[in-house]
Amino acid sequence: MSIGASNPASLLISLHDVSPLTLSECEQAVALLAELGIGASALTVLAIPHHEGGAPIDAHPPTIEFLRRLEADGARLVMHGLTHRMTGRAWSPLGFFRAHLFARGQGEFHASDAEEANRRLDEGIAILRRAGLERATHSFVPPAWLLSRAAREVVAERGFDFYELFNGIIHHGNRYARRVIGWGSLNPVEAIATAMYADLQTLSSNVDVRVAIHPADMRLPRQKRAIRRAVARLRSRMRPESYTTYLASQRRYLGAAAE
């Protein structure tokens, strides 16, 4: 957080959708970020326990090793849904836009009731624990940053260290780092539009910003170039931090302000 004029804003980079199905692309993303001076200790890494219902992390040693190595180097591991796949449909205009246009059916918790949300959280936690990734179970980011009202109540009651929505990181009832930059890689038009938006965001005021990188971004040379450009520009004036380090600094600041 840019607490004072002498303090740079925070650059919060998250690597989404790590699973056996995306391991190669995730390794590429980590390597790309390292070239830009973003080491593992400044990363927040989102792991899908049972991607698409057919790729459990605990049954794939290479993915486990990748995540453990990142954690050993200081990355913060986070549970990212269970399967990453939404069940059912959303019929309201806003719900349809969020679930089927923005998230493209990936908003796993967007239509969940409390029972389903609890079940998915319990199953995801069990898989990560079997994989020896206990720390990842202490925080949560829903796929596409979407939670139904019932799912949000469940997540809030679980007592996670933090959870994240599209409009910020929720920690002890407070919301932090509201700005987010990400890229879309579904088609050339989306890729160009999101790259242009990201470039514009890097020029705006010096506030804490989240940068979300997805495996699909590594499949398009255009998006890799856009990520390099945006991260290099932000890195030049901001402080890279994992969510853990960032939130600890917010607690210290709030505590000092209250004295």
What kind of region is each of these model predictions?
Residues 6, 37, 41-47, 162-163, ...:
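C-terminal domain-boundary segment and adjacent tail
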Residues 12-18, 23, 184-246:
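Catalytic grooves of carbohydrate-active enzymes
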Residues 92-112:
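Active-site gating loops and adjacent loop-to-helix segments of metal-dependent hydrolytic enzymes
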Residues 77-94:
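Short, solvent-exposed beta-strand-terminating loops
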Residues 1-76:
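Active-site beta->alpha N-cap acidic-glycine motif
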